[in-house]
């Protein structure tokens, strides 16, 4: 009980500080939310006859119509339940889960950012559906990385993954070529040289833009830099992890990356790149949805893997859906999850949302994943992408990490001292409850190359 209370307290604090995460979580603008931060799909106002009323909460914004189309089709194809899909901002949704863990006021089906699922499972937000999906013949079609995020330490399932994403390097090739570089950098040394040659302080142009904000969004983008050097979040005081953060700190301190990165969400770093104010960007899969529209032909761009030190690295993003504790329609909700994540729906939804499928058999069902060279880079990046957790106290681990990185970037502490201080928080937690072996690679590239 003491551990449960500690986790609940941590999540309450975490939820109050969380901002909308685009990383692997969708993004864009939505005019559909009401004054309370939520909105229901249009079909909610229609008569559902004698079907049981089921609520589904999600924080998809520009992807909402694609999700609602699947929900509407499911409602038409069966008469046991009628699902109402309701948009709730990510921050509010996480708060509602935390409160609902105590009050019991939860939706029937809920969406969650993949690294957060273990935390809410530990609080009892999601139902154990192992008996329903463990023997499901489709389960072996799911990539191991995303699927791992739906399991607890004992291998029990509490949901199904809906989509994946990862991070790569977007390059303004006009700026790079003008500086004498015809190809994107592949190593840290090359990357540093490109940053030096492309930064133009008088024009407000930096060599690199990324998100290092003090939220999970920052952790999402920061992790590849320590992992590429051979570190990880459970070895922050190692020379490898310190090296990764020192590399980023030097970029800021040397004026090659704006100090504003500590305040930027991924969307703001993205906007800076699209406006021609950064030669390179740490970019997420979902940004493929509107990059051409934003750039509007003002410059040539190209995607590449994030530059490496010892090895290539990226971070897995994405969302999961789970059946919430206490629903009257448990079996029906599980049936919908299987429907939502069938091969065709997974292919259609992820293609429309500029994300990556979580199923191997979905890749060949939409030509976008096999013919678009930009997707090919992200698909390759999935082979090096690491899952965040899963861990019941991931919010605590993440906060310790991004807080320390910000202190280093701003020069408040040395990279070494900052990482050692973060390790002092993280090490006792993972000593008692270790992280699982890193799940690397979604396998998507193997199916399209």
Question: Residue ranges of each PLM-predicted region?
Answer:
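Short, low-complexity disordered leader/linker segments with a strong preference
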Residues: 1-55, 76, 370, 427-449
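Extracytoplasmic "Venus flytrap"/periplasmic binding protein-like
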Residues: 73-142, 149, 174-186, 279-280, ...
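Short, well-ordered beta-strand elements
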Residues: 49-61, 81-86, 108-109, 158, ...
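Glycine-centered hinge/linker elements that transmit conformational signals in sensory
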Residues: 194-197, 201, 234-262, 306
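Periplasmic solute-binding protein
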Residues: 117-125, 130, 144-183, 211-233, ...
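Long, aromatic- and glycine/proline-rich binding clefts that accommodate carbohydrate-like moieties
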Residues: 150, 301-304, 351-403, 407, ...
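Extracytoplasmic/periplasmic substrate-recognition and gating elements
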Residues: 72, 76-77, 177-179, 246, ...
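Hinge/lid segment of periplasmic solute-binding proteins
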Residues: 113-167, 192, 200-203, 218-221, ...
């Amino acid at each position: 009980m003491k551990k449960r209370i500690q986790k609940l307290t941590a999540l309450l604090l975490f939820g109050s500080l969380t901002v909308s995460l685009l990383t692997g979580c969708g993004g864009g603008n939505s005019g559909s939310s009401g004054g309370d931060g939520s909105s229901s799909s249009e079909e909610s106002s229609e008569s559902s006859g004698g079907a049981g009323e089921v609520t589904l909460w999600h924080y998809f914004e520009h992807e909402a119509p694609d999700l609602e189309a699947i929900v509407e089709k499911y409602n038409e194809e069966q008469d046991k339940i009628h699902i109402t899909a309701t948009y709730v901002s990510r921050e509010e949704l996480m708060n509602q889960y935390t409160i609902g863990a105590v009050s019991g006021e939860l939706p029937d089906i809920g969406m969650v950012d993949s690294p957060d699922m273990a935390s809410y499972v530990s609080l009892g937000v999601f139902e154990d559906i192992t008996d329903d999906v463990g023997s499901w013949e489709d389960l072996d079609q799911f990539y191991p990385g995303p699927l791992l995020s739906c399991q607890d330490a004992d291998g029990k399932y509490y949901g199904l993954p809906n989509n994946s994403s990862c991070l790569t390097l977007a390059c303004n090739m006009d700026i790079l070529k003008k500086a004498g570089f015809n190809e994107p950098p592949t190593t840290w040394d090359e990357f540093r040289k490109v940053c030096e040659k492309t930064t133009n302080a008088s024009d407000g142009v930096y060599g690199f833009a990324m998100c290092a904000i003090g939220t999970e969004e920052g952790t999402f983008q920061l992790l590849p830099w320590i992992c590429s050097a051979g570190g990880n979040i459970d070895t922050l005081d190692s020379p490898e992890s310190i090296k990764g953060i020192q590399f980023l700190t030097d970029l800021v301190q040397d004026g090659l990356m704006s100090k504003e990165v500590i305040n930027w969400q991924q969307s703001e770093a993205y906007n800076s790149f699209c406006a021609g104010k950064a030669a390179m960007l740490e970019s997420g899969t979902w940004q493929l949805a509107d990059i051409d529209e934003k750039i509007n032909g003002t410059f040539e761009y190209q995607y590449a893997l994030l530059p490496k030190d010892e090895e290539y690295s990226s971070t897995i993003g994405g969302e999961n859906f789970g059946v919430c504790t206490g629903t009257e329609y448990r079996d029906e909700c599980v049936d919908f999850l299987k429907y939502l994540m069938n091969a065709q729906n997974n292919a259609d939804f992820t293609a429309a949302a500029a994300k990556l499928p979580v199923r191997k058999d979905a890749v060949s069902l939409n030509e976008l994943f096999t013919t678009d060279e930009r997707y090919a880079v992200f698909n390759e990046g999935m082979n090096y992408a690491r899952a965040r957790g899963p861990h019941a106290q991931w919010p605590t681990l993440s906060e310790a990490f991004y807080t320390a990185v910000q202190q280093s970037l701003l020069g408040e502490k040395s990279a070494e001292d900052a990482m050692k201080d973060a390790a002092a928080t993280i090490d006792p937690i993972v000593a008692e409850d270790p992280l699982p072996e890193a799940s690397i690679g979604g396998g998507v590239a193997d199916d399209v190359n």
